[in-house]
Structures are given as C-alpha cells and as structure tokens.
A protein has these predicted regions:
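Pro/Thr/Ser/Gly-rich low-complexity, intrinsically disordered linker/stalk tracts
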Residues: 4-24, 53, 67-84
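Beta-strand-rich modules
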Residues: 48-70
Length: 298
C-alpha cells in the first residue's frame, strides 16, 4: 500500500486483485485511523477526503465481492496531510521553532525577517561567541553574536552570524556543509541576490524597495525607503572584532558565495543597505564579519 498525502486528503494506492475466493471483487473500502473516515472505489488508487491537516493517519482496505467482505488489510504506514505551502501567506519554522513570515518577490520566496536560530537544521549547535571580544576575528567555524545581549534585540533583528555559520561550516576546513536555514530553504548565493536586485529595478532603487519604512528602527533619514517589495529589511548592524556596530544605520546580509579574487578565499559576497540611500550595495568582506541572514526557498 502506498499513501500520498495532500491538503485534507490522502490518495491510497494498492495492488488490487481481481478476485477473492473465486468470486470477482466488486469494490474496495478504505478506512482511516483515527476517525474511521471511509472512501470506496473499484480500483486503485482511492482518494480519502475530510482528513484533518496535521493529524497522522493510517489506512486499512477491505475488499468486497458476492460472498461478502474480506478481513481488513494490514494498516499502512502513517501519513500526515499538510496545508500546501503558499509563499506570502504560509510561514516557515526553523529547528528552534522560530516562525518566519514569507514574501514572494518575482519568482523567489524569501523569509521576511532575519534568522534567529541557534542550531543548524540537523541539531548541531551554533556557538554563541558574543562575549568573545578577542577571538571573534580568528574564528573559522560557524558562530553567532547578538548586538546587546537583550532578548528584544534578537526578536527584532535576529542574530549576527559569521560567514562560516551562514555556509554551514561547523568543523574547520570541512567541505561538508550543514544548513542554517529550515529544510527546503538555503542561504542565497551571490547570483540569487543579483536576481533579486534585477527584479527590483537595479541596485540604485532596489534597496529602498527592500527597507522597512520610518525612523523608529532605521536612523534618519532612511533614504529612499518604501518597502514596496515586502522584504522589510531592518538595520541589525554588523559584528566586527571586538564589538558590534551600526545598529540603526546598516543592514548587511550574507551570500553563500566566496569572493575568489580577494582575501585568498577568506572573503565572501554580501548585500548592504544604508540609512542614507535607497541603494542595494554589493561588496565582499572578511568571512569572520558578523552579518544578518535571510533564507531563500529551494
């Protein structure tokens, strides 16, 4: 028996014998557990509707012929119907169960706020190096930092991650990368950031279309900001060594792409937004810089 889960329903496929005990089979009844929801048909597959999204179900099948009903089949493996993901209305959760709204920009689906996860999506911890004022710049594995140590900062701006965390480098020198983003999401490449820039009309206006408006979180003048894309960028600042800087003034987002021409492989591309203009700036910087992370759906 093979089950394919769908929104509030399941398609139950099975090998359908033509007779049972010498008499032709005239129909099949599929029954869910829990709920006892039934559906009938004369061949495989049979679609069972009226299921509750988020509930795990198993299914049994009974065959019917002129003699009567067969015994129920062995129960299937459990399946859980889920609401289909729709970018812009659906949310996505990280391994810490932080929930992120999503926004569709062109054909790209982005998280609408900065990442605030403390683990890679396999459960491996990302060390908190906020207090490591002397050693932050020498790190070559993933690390995170917050600006003030206040929970309210993390809730609003997320963590600042070095590039190694954004790339998923948990062991120095490793080329086997973990994923800091939720399953089916990833840190965008430099090329994917460029696609966003193009979609929004080019670097000279894209930043304004990405920045949240007003001067409550952005410092004045928050030039060019209209947030027409819904990206809702906030000025979380950066982590340098030994401290964090530019909260309210700058938003910086890692790409997953190394700058192969600068820094001997120790630099990577990022995108930056400033309070002063509506530009979307492209630059590269040392991988030990702490910056915000946004995730892009696969």
């Amino acid at each position: 028996m093979c089950i394919r889960d769908r929104n509030s329903s399941a398609s139950v496929a099975f090998v359908a014998p033509t007779n049972n005990g010498g008499s032709s089979i005239t129909g099949y009844t599929v029954t869910s557990s829990p709920g006892g929801i039934t559906a009938t048909g004369t061949t495989s597959p049979i679609n069972v509707t009226g299921l509750t999204n988020g509930t795990a179900y198993t299914f049994t099948i009974v065959a019917t012929n002129a003699i009567g009903n067969s015994s129920p089949s062995t129960a299937s493996s459990a399946v859980t119907p889920l609401v289909p993901f729709t970018c812009g209305t659906s949310t996505v959760a990280d391994i810490d169960v932080n929930s992120y709204n999503t926004v569709l920009i062109g054909t790209q689906c982005w998280t609408k706020s900065n990442l605030k996860v403390t683990k890679y999506n396999d459960g491996t911890a990302i060390p908190d190096e906020t207090a490591n004022t002397a050693g932050w710049a020498g790190l070559t594995t993933g690390a995170r930092s917050d600006y003030t140590g206040a929970a309210s900062y993390i809730a609003t701006y997320g963590y600042l991650y070095n590039w190694y965390a954004a790339k998923g480098v948990s062991t120095s020198g490793s080329t086997t990368y973990k994923n800091i983003c939720p399953t089916d999401w990833h840190v965008p490449t430099d090329g994917e950031w460029t696609a966003l820039e193009t979609q929004l009309g080019g670097f000279s206006v894209a930043g304004g279309k990405m920045k949240s408006t007003g001067t409550t979180l952005w410092n004045s003048p928050n030039g060019g900001a209209n947030n027409s894309s819904g990206f809702s960028a906030l000025p979380g600042g950066q982590r340098l060594s030994p401290a964090s800087v530019d909260i309210g003034n700058e938003a910086s987002f890692w790409s997953a792409t190394t700058d192969v021409t600068t820094g001997g492989g120790g630099w990577a591309w990022f995108r930056g937004l400033s309070r002063l203009s509506g530009f979307l700036n492209i630059a590269s910087t040392s991988k030990d810089m702490g910056q915000s992370v946004r995730c892009l759906k696969d």
